[in-house]
């Protein structure tokens, strides 16, 4: 598993792979399925599977969740990217388990690799891996700039930012979009560029202002 979410596929595939199901060594928070028990836990760089014909190596990519990992198939320069990079949309980074600063650094980590193809959990295969990763990271940088512009234009709430920035997105997806906006704002607060207006902790209902 690339992350211990509340999903059912480990039970479905277990009998076909000798019930081998590996999972990141560090415990996640928000999205974790506490009832899931992996066969063993693995760490970054560990060869999780070695058949003699191919190997599967762990690539820690925290950020989407606190313990997310990808899995590399070196013999095909392929990377199973889980929920870290998706083939049909951008990834939600939802605090507190998701962390935007860590997520963006994990994207840069993948850019330093030489994978040819990405196999995401959601969406089809991505054959232009490096170009796609660059686009994915640039999207986050662009969104960050748009959030800063919203604040400069006195749009100080997450609800207002979502209405402005995601006007072309279905309303039922706005809640998830708001979680990623909050994650961006937490990153900007950590960088000293934004503060919560009343000095409280960042949260979905807070108002945010630029640091002058």
Segments from the language model and where they lie:
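Short hydrophobic/aromatic-enriched beta-strand-loop microsegments
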Residues: 1, 80-82, 173
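Generic structural signal for secondary-structure transition and capping sites
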Residues: 47, 115-116, 156, 193
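Metallo-beta-lactamase
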Residues: 10-39, 48, 55-144
């Amino acid at each position: 598993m690339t992350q211990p979410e509340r999903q059912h596929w480990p039970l479905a595939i277990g009998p076909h792979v000798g019930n081998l199901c590996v999972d990141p060594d560090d415990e996640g928070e928000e999205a974790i399925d506490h009832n899931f028990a992996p066969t063993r836990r693995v760490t970054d760089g560990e060869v999780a599977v070695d058949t003699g014909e191919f190997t599967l190596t762990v690539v820690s990519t925290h950020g989407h969740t606190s313990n997310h990992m990808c899995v590399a198939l070196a013999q095909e320069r392929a990377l199973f990217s889980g929920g870290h990079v998706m083939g049909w949309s951008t990834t939600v980074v939802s605090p507190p388990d998701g962390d935007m600063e860590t997520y963006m650094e994990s994207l840069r980590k993948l850019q330093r690799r030489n994978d040819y193809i990405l196999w995401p959990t959601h969406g089809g295969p991505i054959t232009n891996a490096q170009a796609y990763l660059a686009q994915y990271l640039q999207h986050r940088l662009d969104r960050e700039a748009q959030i800063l512009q919203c604040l400069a234009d006195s749009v100080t709430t997450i609800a207002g930012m979502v209405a402005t920035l995601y006007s072309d997105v279905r309303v039922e997806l706005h809640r998830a979009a708001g979680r990623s906006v909050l994650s961006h704002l937490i990153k900007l607060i950590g960088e000293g560029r934004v503060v919560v207006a009343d000095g409280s902790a960042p949260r979905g209902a807070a108002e945010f202002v630029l640091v002058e």
